[in-house]
UniProtKB/Swiss-Prot annotation:
This is Forkhead box protein A2-B. Acts as a transcriptional activator during early development, limiting the extent of mesoderm formation in the gastrula. Binds to DNA via the target sequence 5'-GT[AC]AACA-3', with 5'-GTAAACA-3' being the preferred binding site. InterPro entries: Fork-head_N, Fork_head_dom, Forkhead_box_C, FOX_domain-containing, TF_fork_head_CS_1, TF_fork_head_CS_2, WH-like_DNA-bd_sf, WH_DNA-bd_sf. Keywords: Activator, Developmental protein, DNA-binding, Nucleus, Transcription, Transcription regulation. The gene is foxa2-b. Residues 261-282, 315-331 have a biased composition (Low complexity). Residues 147-241 bind DNA. It comes from Xenopus laevis.
Length: 433
């Protein structure tokens, strides 16, 4: 290898590669060729060193061209190998007069047999396989830092269930997640905010205040006793069904345990649309949405806490409004059953059809005063634009008044009749055929 170092130095070739050193290098080449054919990687390296040396010193450029493509693996065909063997044999016959050309030919062809040719090329590919095998290690190392396929509810549930007391503080939940998943050791403010939201807005987590024998900071969080079947068969990748707290009616008496905090905030993530429509705009901001639903059910069944006007049935309330506001009674009765005051049409997938009657009654109870300001504007808009919804009784009165050349603002007698059929569609008589 001294020759290789000197060759990189770009010094005079003749001073380093004289006759004795050339003979010794050919002897090393023959020794390398006569080695075991299975150890072909060492023999090929010996051949490449000696061939480059002798080709440079003896100006035998054809040997170098015959050797280099097969060594570098650019053309590992069998055609380049016999040429290399012949070049080595001729080189050996020129340099070593005492060695017969046939022995050098036999030795070189023995090392470059077709079966050995495959083995001689395999160390080159094996080296690339070694380099390629290092990549999955780095990939696996980065894969451990990837985001785990668990939702925040799954992470909180796993953390609580592995604790001996089955309850953890918020900081203990954070620490458990960071210890188990390295991904959550960065961007802590972002995902910890999501953890707090998941704890607050999901009914499956209960907030337990600290007892006097456990001093410290922060309340404990535990799982709801009825939420054990959220993750079936212990698989935390997908939650089977959302847990609702209305399955346990005795939760209203649990004074210290609040199932949810901040139910009056507008952007409540994790709540369904019915819970948002009831819980977010209710005046009872300290209680949970499911408690609001239960309270609305109780208010519908027993009328304490409500005025006599709102405690009555929807039909009697519509009749009560008939005696007071005859001009807008149809729209008031319609909007009572469909409490969304921004729209007057009845879409099949609107929130009005998806909400139950108890939720609609409770929702209307809080929006009654707000609707009173909008009903005149909506009526005037419908009559001016000559366009109203399918389910609005004003459609029949407007179309009938238009067909019979009446004034658009004149109330039609048909509006008083359609107020008793709020559930059906009112269509113009002229277009019914």
């Amino acid at each position: 290898m001294l020759g290789a170092v000197k060759m990189e130095g770009h010094e005079d070739w003749s001073s380093y590669y004289g006759e004795p050193e050339a003979y010794s290098s050919v002897g090393n080449m023959n020794a390398g060729l006569s080695m075991n054919p299975m150890n072909t990687y060492m023999s090929m390296s010996a051949m490449s060193t000696s061939a480059n040396m002798t080709a440079s010193s003896m100006n035998m450029s054809y040997v170098n061209t015959g050797m280099s493509p097969s060594i570098t693996g650019m053309s590992p065909g069998t055609g380049a190998m016999p040429g290399m063997g012949n070049g080595v044999a001729s080189m050996a016959s020129h340099l070593s007069p005492s060695m017969s050309p046939m022995s050098a030919q036999a030795t070189s062809m023995n090392a470059l047999a077709p079966y050995t040719n495959i083995n001689s090329m395999s160390p080159i590919y094996g080296q690339s396989n070694i380099n390629r095998s290092r990549d999955p290690k780095t990939y696996r190392r980065s894969y451990t830092h990837a985001k785990p396929p668990y939702s925040y509810i799954s992470l909180i549930t796993m953390a609580i269930q592995q604790s001996p007391s089955k309850m953890l503080t918020l900081s203990e939940v954070y620490q458990w997640i960071m210890d188990l998943f390295p991904f959550y050791r960065q961007n802590q403010q972002r995902w910890q905010n999501s953890i707090r939201h998941s704890l607050s807005f999901n009914d499956c987590f209960l907030k337990v205040p600290r007892s006097p024998d456990k001093p410290g900071k922060g309340s404990f969080w535990t799982l709801h006793p009825d939420s054990g079947n959220m993750f079936e068969n212990g698989c935390y990748l997908r939650r089977q069904k959302r847990f609702k707290c209305d399955k346990k009616p005795s939760l209203r008496e649990g004074g210290g345990k609040k199932l949810s905090e901040g139910a009056s905030s507008v952007g409540s993530v994790g709540n369904s649309s019915s819970e948002r429509s009831v819980g977010n705009e209710s005046p009872h901001s300290s209680s949970s949405p499911c408690q609001e639903q239960k309270r609305s059910l109780v208010d519908m069944k027993s009328s304490h806490g409500l005025s006599p006007e709102h405690a009555t049935s929807p039909a009697s309330q519509a009749q009560h409004l008939l005696s007071q506001h005859h001009s807008v009674l149809s729209h008031e009765a319609q909007s009572h059953l469909k409490p969304e005051h921004h729209y007057s049409f009845n879409h099949p997938f609107s929130i009005n059809n998806l909400m139950s009657s108890e939720q609609q009654h409770h929702h209307h109870h809080h929006h009654h005063n707000h609707q009173h300001h909008h009903k005149m504007d909506l009526k005037a808009y419908e009559q001016v634009m000559h366009y109203s919804g399918y389910g609005s009784p004003m459609a029949g009165s407007l179309a009938m008044s238009t067909v019979t050349n009446k004034s658009g603002l004149e109330p039609s007698p048909i509006s008083s009749d359609t107020s008793y059929y709020q559930g059906g569609y009112s269509r113009p008589i002229m277009n019914s055929s």
